[in-house]
Regions:
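Sequence-specific dsDNA recognition surfaces
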Residues: 2-3, 17-69, 86, 91-92, ...
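Non-catalytic DNA-recognition/assembly elements of restriction-modification systems
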Residues: 1-30, 37-52, 136-148, 155-205, ...
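Hydrophobic residues in beta-strands and at strand termini
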Residues: 10, 100, 135-137, 224, ...
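A short glycine-rich beta-alpha junction/loop motif
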Residues: 2-4, 89-96, 110, 120-141, ...
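Short coil/turn segments at secondary-structure boundaries
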Residues: 33-39, 124-126, 187-190, 207-213, ...
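Periplasmic-binding protein-like
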Residues: 310-316
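A common structural junction motif
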Residues: 117-120, 311, 355-356
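A short beta-sheet element
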Residues: 48-114, 119, 223, 248-308, ...
Length: 384
């Protein structure tokens, strides 16, 4: 058997099998639950192709997946792999149950599959690409040793992510305790439109034909693709010549500005909004991205927390249907609480302290992720 070069890195004493010889699709014969029938709570979790471990719950005992636990579930559209250790029901459309055909430890197989690079084909199905891969089959004792090492490294990464999540939940809880839910306003605060509490600017229509390469004579452009929940991502950056910036001063982003993506603003991990905490090079705002700048830092923290909330989502999506964009009119009309300056300052101090800790946690989580990736690479090349 001729193995493609990308799958020839395995040690000589490992067997290497085509995917279809090593793994089978065991989805057939299982009852699936439609998304509209998910419950918020129930006796049995529903495992679908979403990024979260569970998509919802059901009480349909007769629909429990027939596969022997633990099992691996693959998202045909999302490329997500999940390791499920308790009885579950499959969500409809795109969730596939995978079972080993060869002598494969399921944790080893799970870690191997997760590190495969399956290129995105949009909302197409990806199982066909998975079937083109090959699976290493080391001696079972070696599989278990590798899986145990990777489990420990992954547990460290997940604990650090949990610390980030807890800090974020803490800050949201402080906001609700101090000011109340913006949806119901139980404390009766007066409100003003965002446009009266802060400067709100939407970006300039920089023409892509005039983009340039990064250089000392260029500035960075902040597009919707660069805005993620809580952070800016510059992997796919675009640049503009400094000589063509005359008259565009209002689009220059300053430190602590809030930036909000207005096209497809909600993704699985949250609202695409963040505070700009580090400016390495000048950044200018592109159309369909908004910049929000309050009159003082304390108000800025309140505004950020108010926007990154369920209340803002309901303001923009009153019918709870997915919308492709936020309009400038909706954004500027969003009501912000008017609260005493003493409360503003108190919340700002808590917010600043918590966000500094979150940054430290995020740095530690990135280090853990890099360690896991390094160990994974070594593990599946026989160097661990």
């Amino acid at each position: 058997m001729t193995v493609p070069e990308e799958f020839s890195r395995f040690p000589d004493h490992w067997d290497v099998l085509p995917f279809s010889k090593a793994v089978k699709d065991a989805t057939s014969g299982n009852t699936k639950v439609q998304k509209g029938d998910y419950l918020e709570s129930g006796s049995i979790p529903v495992v679908d192709q979403g990024q979260s471990l569970y998509g919802g719950y059901t009480n349909e005992q007769s629909a429990i997946c027939k596969s022997e636990l633990p099992t691996i579930v693959f998202g045909d559209h999302t490329r997500a792999f999940k390791f499920i250790e308790e009885r579950f029901v499959l969500g409809a459309d795109g969730a596939k149950v995978l079972e080993p055909l060869a002598k494969l430890d399921k944790r080893f197989l799970f870690h191997y599959l997760k590190q495969l690079r399956i290129e995105s084909a949009g909302y197409s199905r990806h199982f066909k690409f998975l079937k083109e891969t090959y699976v290493p089959v080391p001696p079972l004792s070696e599989q278990k040793r590798i899986a145990a090492i990777l489990d420990k490294a992954d547990a460290l990464r997940r604990k650090r992510q949990q610390a980030i999540d807890l800090a974020d939940k803490f800050l949201r809880s402080v906001f609700l305790d101090m000011f109340g839910d913006p949806v119901t306003n139980p404390k009766g605060w007066p409100t003003k439109p965002l446009s009266q509490m802060a400067s709100v600017v939407t970006g300039y229509p920089f023409k892509s034909a005039d983009y340039v390469d990064e250089s000392a004579e260029s500035v960075r452009l902040c597009r919707g693709a660069n805005v993620l929940p809580g952070t800016l991502d510059w992997k796919d950056a675009r640049f503009w010549p400094q000589e063509h910036l005359v008259g565009l001063e209002e689009y220059l982003i300053e430190q602590d500005d809030i930036v909000l993506a207005m096209d497809r603003p909600w993704i699985s991990s949250g609202l695409k909004v963040c505070s700009v905490d580090v400016i390495e090079v000048p950044i200018y705002l592109v159309q369909r991205v908004a910049r929000i700048r309050a009159r003082n830092q304390a108000m800025q923290d309140l505004i950020y927390a108010s926007i990154d909330s369920v209340a803002f989502a309901r303001h923009c999506c009153p019918t709870e249907t997915t919308i492709p964009h936020i309009s400038p009119v909706e954004l500027k009309a969003y009501p912000i609480f008017e609260v005493p300056s003493s409360l503003l300052e108190c919340f700002s101090q808590v917010s600043r302290t918590t966000k500094r800790k979150i940054k430290l946690f995020e740095h530690a989580e990135r280090e853990s992720a890099e360690l896991f990736a390094s160990l994974s690479q070594k593990a599946f090349s026989g160097q661990l």
